[in-house]
């Protein structure tokens, strides 16, 4: 029989093509590495490995890392190089979302290098290995095994190699050779500054082609280059092998306080161990300092496998709630080794009063801890199970004491980045809290124990979660919980007045009782005080919502998790927002609750509305507040503001600030002019960036810095998709806030005092992008301004001064190009 040759199936041809392409890529990569070996010598991933006894101890670089034939003294990393990095590099490369994971706020970050893997990837199907600086690897050679590539020269040392073999130098030199234009906007076809843009992260084998294809993409990306003196400083430092010095030693007083706090956190009784675990899971993101330390050395609370007195050995787990893998956990204070940036700065002061307060909260009641909870994911992810042995009132009191910090965990933590993560909240709202003594909601331990199963959180599914199944389960659980909660309220508020007394007043002295949250589209801010115009929505948080927000978005969230984990986290937050709004509606007359709910949720399905107030979440008791007007929401907020007036923070109150500022006291019309700006409403505000710094140059004295926060109107925020279809331009408002709001500066306007009214008129008249371009041409400092860095340095200095010098750097990576 004659044989017949049959064509290969299409799948086989595709496989062969894929294999062939892979072989070509591999051979090209091999050739590129061979060329590098010939030019710079063989790679030595251990060149910059160092010796450090513990994460909070000084590092001693190996001799090889500083080897150079040059006899000239090397610049000091801490005194010369790091300050330059901070004001030119860290302003874009300092946060979780630093491009290419290149964090330049420490020598460790520089030595770690860059990665092609994105931290934020809302489409990943499987979890990825965490890559947290100072935590998931230590030595540069260990980071190479995690697919990080060097930006320093890890090949044969020498002045020429240490410059030209360094990606850091090559990117800076690319900008020197191809500077930006010095006016107007940068071409959108060449420059994409969106946070979800495709990242291009060339390694040393690719830098040549990158330079040829993208000559305008030198560093700092999209900004003017550093000057010749600064460039020479970096070059000399690199030529000397990129050396670095130890951190300055801690003072004796700080060492003593570290010992005292680690002793407190290292208690051996079951209750002491459980309290320490609870504190750690709430403070692991905080930037801790001692209140009497004049330089505010920052620390982080970490889990260590070693006790106090021994070098810290950090227990690196995906989440702080995960099993530590050791028999005994020690909670230690590890020194922060990198530049503090505003996005992640969550200050928490330690001192004698704090220690006494924690003892009072957690140790004054009888000891009810008979066994330690496990770290099984179903237990550890549910604080109502894990910490059931600690009184709910104690846990709530701890969170209330620093309520802004607790909210910061959500606002400043890894979860708070990008539109999808943030379109679960309105652009501006006020937050109040149920009084821990007067309001029984969420504070009866028996009720919480009985409902603990229904209060499960998405972290219980781990970081590789299915997409749909968990949400369906949580919706069912929340329906059951809302029914039980409604019945509980009917029974337990029957003999209490539903009035202002149920709202926490800060115990007469704590300004954390009233907070304002701003959403800036893809980032957010929380501050003390009632800031901005009256918001559309208001939250009243009980312990149950407050604790779940933390364990949903902070302690239980894994930024390296898959799409299922991230999506379920976002969807669950809808429940918590609606429950906080439900708590507020209870204070209004029954006849006004549904109409206000419907205003908040215009266009949302009826099923969603019923979860805010209706058959799913109901409270049929009439309020005991005697309303006198037809606007009960406004009347309630005015009355509550008067009640809280002794403790409401005035830092961001425009009238209060101008009234005590010596440079503005003589200007009788400035407040009126700024209030006119703040009263603007409507579509014209949609052309402003999310946040902009307004610098008013006064006739005398220092400039006045304010933040313009655009609050976008929405028909509702109940859906994760198609937010643009729910934007209501006619309902845009503007908050004009003294000082600085937000971690990301989108624009800087410089307006002479005499032109404030003209600026207001220009903003009110915005009707197109060309209108905004005219405004920007007159008042904005654009990316292309040749003096951009001088203005930026002045801005950072003013921000530092506003916080007493203890601040995080403002991030410029989202600065506009318009």
Regions found by a protein language model. Give the residues of each.
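Short regulatory "switch" loops immediately downstream of catalytic or recognition motifs
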Residues: 1-3, 176
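Hydrophobic h-region of N-terminal signal peptides that target proteins for export
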Residues: 22-30
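Acidic/proline-rich low-complexity IDRs
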Residues: 18-22, 35
């Amino acid at each position: 029989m004659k044989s017949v040759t049959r064509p290969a199936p299409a799948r086989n041809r595709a496989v062969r093509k894929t294999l062939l392409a892979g072989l070509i890529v591999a051979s090209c990569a091999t050739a590129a590495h061979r060329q590098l070996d010939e030019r710079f010598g063989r790679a030595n991933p251990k060149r910059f490995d160092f010796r450090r006894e513990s994460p909070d101890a000084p590092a001693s670089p190996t001799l090889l890392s500083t080897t150079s034939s040059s006899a000239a003294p090397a610049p000091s990393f801490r005194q010369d190089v790091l300050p330059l990095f901070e004001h030119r590099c860290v302003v874009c490369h300092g946060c979780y979302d630093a491009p290419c994971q290149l964090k330049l706020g420490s020598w460790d970050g520089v030595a770690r290098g860059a990665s092609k893997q994105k931290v934020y990837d809302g489409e990943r199907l499987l979890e990825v290995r965490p890559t947290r600086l100072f935590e998931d690897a230590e030595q540069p050679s260990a980071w190479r095994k995690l697919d990080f590539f060097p930006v320093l020269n890890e090949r044969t040392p020498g002045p020429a190699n240490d410059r030209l073999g360094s990606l850091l130098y090559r990117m800076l030199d690319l900008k020197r050779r191809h500077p930006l234009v010095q006016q107007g906007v940068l071409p959108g076809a060449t420059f994409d500054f969106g946070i979800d843009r495709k990242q291009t992260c060339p390694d040393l084998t690719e830098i040549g082609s990158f330079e040829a294809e993208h000559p305008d993409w030198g560093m700092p990306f999209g900004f003017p280059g550093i000057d010749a003196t600064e460039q020479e400083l970096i070059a000399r430092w690199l030529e000397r092998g990129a050396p670095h010095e130890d951190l300055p030693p801690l003072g004796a007083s700080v060492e003593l306080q570290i010992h005292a706090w680690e002793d407190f956190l290292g208690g051996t009784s079951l209750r002491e161990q459980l309290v320490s675990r609870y504190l750690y899971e709430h403070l692991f993101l905080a930037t801790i300092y001692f209140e009497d330390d004049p330089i505010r050395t920052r620390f982080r609370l970490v889990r260590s496998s070693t006790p106090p007195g021994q070098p810290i050995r950090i227990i690196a787990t995906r989440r702080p709630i995960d099993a530590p893998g050791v028999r005994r956990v020690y909670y230690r204070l590890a020194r922060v080794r990198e530049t503090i940036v505003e996005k992640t700065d969550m200050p928490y002061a330690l001192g004698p009063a704090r220690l006494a307060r924690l003892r009072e909260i957690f140790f004054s009641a009888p000891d009810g801890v008979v066994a330690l909870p496990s770290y099984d994911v179903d237990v550890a992810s549910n604080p109502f199970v894990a910490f059931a042995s600690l009184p709910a009132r104690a846990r709530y009191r701890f969170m209330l004491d620093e309520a802004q910090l607790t909210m910061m965990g959500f606002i400043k933590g890894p979860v708070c980045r990008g539109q999808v993560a943030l379109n679960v909240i309105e652009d501006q709202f006020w937050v109040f809290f149920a009084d821990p003594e007067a309001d029984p909601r969420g504070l009866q331990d028996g009720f919480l124990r009985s409902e603990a199963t229904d209060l499960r959180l998405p972290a219980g599914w781990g970081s590789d979660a299915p997409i749909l199944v968990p949400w369906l389960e949580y919706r069912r659980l929340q329906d059951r919980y809302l029914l039980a909660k409604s019945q509980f309220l009917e029974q337990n508020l029957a003999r209490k007045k539903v009035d202002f007394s149920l709202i926490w007043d800060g115990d007469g002295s704590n300004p954390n009782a009233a907070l304002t949250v701003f959403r800036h589209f893809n980032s957010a801010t929380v501050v003390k005080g009632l800031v901005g115009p009256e918001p559309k929505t208001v939250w009243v948080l009980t312990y149950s919502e407050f604790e779940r927000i933390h364990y949903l978005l902070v302690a239980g969230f894994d930024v390296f998790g898959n799409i299922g984990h991230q999506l379920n986290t976002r969807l669950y937050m809808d429940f918590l927002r609606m429950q906080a709004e439900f708590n507020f509606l209870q204070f209004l007359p029954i006849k006004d609750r549904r109409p206000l709910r419907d205003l908040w949720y215009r266009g949302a399905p009826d099923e969603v509305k019923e979860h805010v107030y209706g058959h799913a979440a109901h409270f049929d008791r009439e309020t005991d507040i005697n309303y006198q007007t037809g606007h009960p929401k406004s009347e309630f907020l005015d009355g509550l503001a008067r009640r809280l007036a002794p403790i409401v923070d005035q830092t961001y109150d425009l009238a209060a600030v101008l009234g005590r500022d010596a440079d503005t006291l003589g200007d009788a019309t400035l407040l009126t002019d700024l209030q006119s700006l703040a009263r603007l409403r409507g579509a014209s505000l949609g052309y402003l960036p999310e946040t902009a710094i307004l610098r008013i140059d006064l006739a005398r004295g220092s400039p006045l810095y304010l933040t313009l926060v655009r609050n976008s109107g929405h028909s509702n925020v109940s859906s994760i998709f198609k937010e643009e279809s729910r934007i209501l331009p006619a309902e845009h408002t503007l908050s004009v806030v003294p000082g600085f709001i937000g971690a990301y500066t989108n624009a800087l306007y410089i307006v002479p005092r005499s032109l404030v009214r003209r600026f207001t008129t220009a903003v009110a008249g915005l009707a197109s992008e060309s209108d905004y371009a005219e405004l920007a041409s007159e008042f904005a400092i654009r990316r292309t301004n040749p003096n951009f860095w001088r203005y930026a340095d002045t801005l950072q200095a003013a921000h530092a001064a506003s916080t007493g010098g203890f601040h995080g750097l403002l991030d410029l990576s989202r600065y506009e190009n318009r």
